[in-house]
Amino acid sequence: MGLCFPCPAESAPPSPSPEEKREKLAEAAERRQKEAATRGILDIQSVEAKKKKKEQLEKQMATSGPPTAGGLRWTVS
């Protein structure tokens, strides 16, 4: 009897500081986001390579500017 409560001499275990809690929560959130981003993808590297290639093509199109006036012409005779 009487063993339901801890000894009064024992103190509660120290809780982590708010900064440590914040860091752990941020790490957990980043891990969840990373897992959610790769869910359902078997080959992550190929998807990333395709994304980089697409970005490079878009960048190249943006830097090339509008087409010149020497393009195709429509003539009606």
UniProtKB/Swiss-Prot annotation:
It comes from Mus musculus. It comes from the Eukaryota. Residues 1-77 are annotated as: Disordered. A lipid is attached at residue 2 (N-myristoyl glycine). Its main location: membrane. This is Small VCP/p97-interacting protein. Residues 21-33 are annotated as: VCP/p97-interacting motif (VIM). One of its GO terms (cellular component) is lysosomal membrane. The keyword Cell membrane applies. Belongs to the SVIP family. Keywords: Cell membrane, Endoplasmic reticulum, Golgi apparatus, Lipoprotein, Lysosome, Membrane, Myristate, Palmitate, Phosphoprotein. The keyword Transferase does not apply. Residues 18-37 have a biased composition (Basic and acidic residues). It is found in: Membrane; Smooth endoplasmic reticulum membrane; Golgi apparatus membrane; Cell membrane. It is a lipid-anchor; Peripheral membrane protein. Interacts (via VIM motif) with VCP/p97. Forms a complex with VCP/p97 and DERL1. Negative regulator of the ER-associated degradation pathway (ERAD) of misfolded proteins. It competes with AMFR/gp78 for binding VCP/p97, and inhibits AMFR/gp78-VCP/p97 complex formation that is required for degradation of ERAD substrates. Involved in the regulation of adrenal cortisol and dehydroepiandrosterone (DHEA) biosynthesis. The modification Phosphoserine is found at residue 46. A lipid is attached at residues 4, 7 (S-palmitoyl cysteine). GO terms for molecular function: ATPase binding. Highly expressed in the medulla spinalis, adrenal gland, cerebrum, cerebellum, and sciatic nerve. One of its GO terms (biological process) is positive regulation of autophagy.
